[in-house]
Amino acid sequence: MQFIKSLIFNIFLYFGLIFIFILAIPTLILPNKVTIFFGRLSAKYIVLILKLVMNTKVIFHGEENLKKVDNFFVASAHQSMFETFALQIPLDGPIFILKKELLNIPLFGWYLRKIGSIAIKRETTTKENLNFFDKIKERLEKNKRPLLIFPQGTRVKLDEQPPFKKGVGRIYKALNLPCIPVALNTGKVWPKNSFMKFSGDIHI
């Protein structure tokens, strides 16, 4: 039964996202706020099918903390693909710091470029690092939106606790902005690299 539910969910997930991304193609030449709308729409769509197909409820905690500061960046745990979409709901179109490879994915990568996402290289020189921080500052001043980074660098299993990458500390020092950490349990419902999805509440 769990396999059947997972199969139905994945069909709705991928075909639904492809449909939304195709609808969003014209937004690539429109203002960012229109593109961001479709990003949040895709997140809400996933939340909906999680509820309808998997009987999974998504609960956001601490959203009031986002209103206490004007400028900040968010450092989130990373257990599944889901939070890359879901965090667009409370953050309303964050600026992603992500692996360069993600920008090369058709449709998805185009959207990430349009909303001002910043690619990070695994191995960088000191000069490249300085240019990277300058780019972040410029992007934040221009867009007035929060920065979102996944300091673990990749998705991890629910019971794993790999060390955080040093980059988040460097960003914290370079930007001199408050950091809002995000804990979650998405790996319980949506395990890393797994076809199977499971029922249960998601807490972010």
Provide a role label for each language-model segment:
Residues 113-144:
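A membrane-cytosol interface segment of integral membrane proteins
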